[in-house]
């Protein structure tokens, strides 16, 4: 089984590589420090499993990487590394193509089990995250039912269309303001207008929307 590990912390990449390489049926063929590099390593090695950190640097979101990689390389099973403060992303990651989730502080045995589970084509979700996943599924179902059939994308202003992909990529208000030569308050106002116009309730919904509109590219 060929594995690629993508995490922006070298200690995580090294530690997980040691654990998995110790297994007779597993080989870590490459590691990556961000979503862009993860895509390149998957393209190069065509691994059976990609272990991907959800919390990537701005511009290289784990959610974006999951969507791009699962679309281009459906044969590679994606296992997401996450923390409790990432719970709002769980449902959206599954929709984007992830096959499972595991907490970064999980025991070695659980990591190995998770890798083998997704490799076999099954879904693995840490029991500690299951409740959050179910709640998010219910909330998303309700949102889908009440959403309008018309697409509000066309009513976004030119500036809002510039800001939307930057927010989705994980850039903060200050970073966006500097990129576009506007004030932080202006960015905050546009962000509020975008969420209102598109009827979006959370950051994961905004990222998913941007992906659907093909506004995000590596």
Curated annotation (Swiss-Prot):
Protein localization: Cytoplasm
GO biological process terms on file: phosphorelay signal transduction system; regulation of DNA-templated transcription
InterPro entries: CheY-like_superfamily, Sig_transdc_resp-reg_C-effctor, Sig_transdc_resp-reg_receiver, Tscrpt_reg_LuxR_C, WalR-like
Ranges for domain HTH luxR-type: 149-214
Coiled coil feature spans: none
Spans traversing the lipid bilayer: none
PANTHER family: TRANSCRIPTIONAL REGULATORY PROTEIN YDFI, TWO-COMPONENT RESPONSE REGULATOR
Name of this chain's protein: Oxygen regulatory protein NreC
Organism whose genome encodes this protein: Staphylococcus epidermidis (strain ATCC 12228 / FDA PCI 1200)
């Amino acid at each position: 089984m060929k594995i690629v590990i993508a995490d922006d912390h070298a200690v995580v990449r090294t530690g997980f590589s040691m654990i998995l390489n110790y297994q007779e049926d597993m080989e870590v063929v490459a590691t990556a420090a961000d979503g862009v590099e993860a895509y390149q390593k998957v393209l190069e090695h065509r691994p059976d499993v990609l272990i991907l950190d959800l919390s990537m640097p701005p511009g290289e979101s784990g959610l974006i990487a999951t969507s791009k990689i699962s679309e281009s390389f459906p044969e590679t099973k994606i296992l997401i590394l996450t923390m409790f403060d990432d719970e709002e992303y769980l449902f959206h990651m599954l929709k984007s193509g992830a096959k499972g989730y595991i907490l970064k502080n999980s025991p070695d045995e659980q990591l190995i089990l998770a890798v083998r589970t997704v490799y076999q084509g099954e879904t693995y979700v840490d029991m500690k995250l299951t409740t959050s996943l179910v709640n998010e599924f219910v909330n998303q179902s309700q949102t889908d039912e009440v959403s309008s059939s018309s697409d509000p994308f066309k009513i976004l202003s030119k500036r809002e269309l510039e800001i939307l992909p930057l927010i989705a990529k994980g850039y903060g208000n200050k970073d966006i303001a500097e990129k576009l030569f506007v004030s932080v308050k202006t960015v905050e106002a546009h962000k509020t207008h975008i969420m209102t116009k598109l009827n979006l309730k959370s950051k994961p919904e905004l990222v998913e929307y941007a992906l659907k509109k093909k506004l995000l590219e590596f």
